[in-house]
């Protein structure tokens, strides 16, 4: 096998009746045996593990689900496991029964190409009954309005209570509503008074600061005799007259 220069070059085919030496042999990924070019496929060398990669799925007639058969397991055992654990006969109608147009006396099957959802009622219909008048569209669902205090007052002023118990209940609700409104008004008035008081205090503080600033007087001191002068001109005259024009100590 091989050549004098490369003695390990090439291998014999693993098929008994072949044994051909191949310098570029093929190794089977299932049985891990070496084969020549002619016997490299699973069918050519009758690979015992060639069907491990095959996927076989059987549709269950009871639930319409796909059951995958394991190559290393008996199909009967796989089927029994599915029947005992996974099988749900109620799913058969959902999977097999095809959707139809909901309009009475219309037997049109709804598929991907002929199905249109109504914008108002959000229900699928066929092309023939895609418009609202054709399928007696009920229109969009009205959203439930949230409880509002004004609506509560308006409805209760128009409609009288039917019994004494209901009237007492409505009166208690009215009383609590009036109390909450009066409490809210008091809070608002207190906040307004507090804000106006703060504004007055701030104005008084500004006036006081202005008066203090106006009362301050700047005095220039003579560096020679430490005499103070309010007017800088008087300070210069004093230096020229009394200190002969010298301000340095």
Swiss-Prot record:
Q: Which UniProt keywords apply?
A: Metal-binding, Repeat, Zinc, Zinc-finger
Q: Name one GO cellular component term.
A: nucleus
Query: Any idea which positions bind Zn(2+) 2?
Result: 28, 31, 45, 47
Native species of this protein? Arabidopsis thaliana (Mouse-ear cress)
From which residue to which does the signal peptide run? none
| InterPro entries hit by this protein | AN1-like_Znf, Znf_AN1, Znf_C2H2_type
Q: What does this protein do?
A: May be involved in environmental stress response.
ZnF (AN1-type) residues: 7-55, 95-145
Please give the biological process terms from Gene Ontology that the record holds. response to abscisic acid; response to salt stress; stress response to metal ion
Fetch the SUPFAM superfamilies from UniProt.
Answer: AN1-like Zinc finger
Give the residues the record marks as binding Zn(2+) 3: 101, 106, 126, 129
Write out the ranges of the annotated region (Disordered): 194-213
User: Which residues are recorded as binding Zn(2+) 4?
Assistant: 118, 121, 135, 137
Q: Which GO terms describe its molecular function?
A: transcription cis-regulatory region binding; zinc ion binding
Q: Locate the residues binding Zn(2+) 1.
A: 13, 18, 36, 39
Q: Zinc finger spans (C2H2-type)?
A: 220-243
* Compositionally biased intervals (Basic and acidic residues): 201-210
Q: Can you name this protein? A: Zinc finger AN1 and C2H2 domain-containing stress-associated protein 13
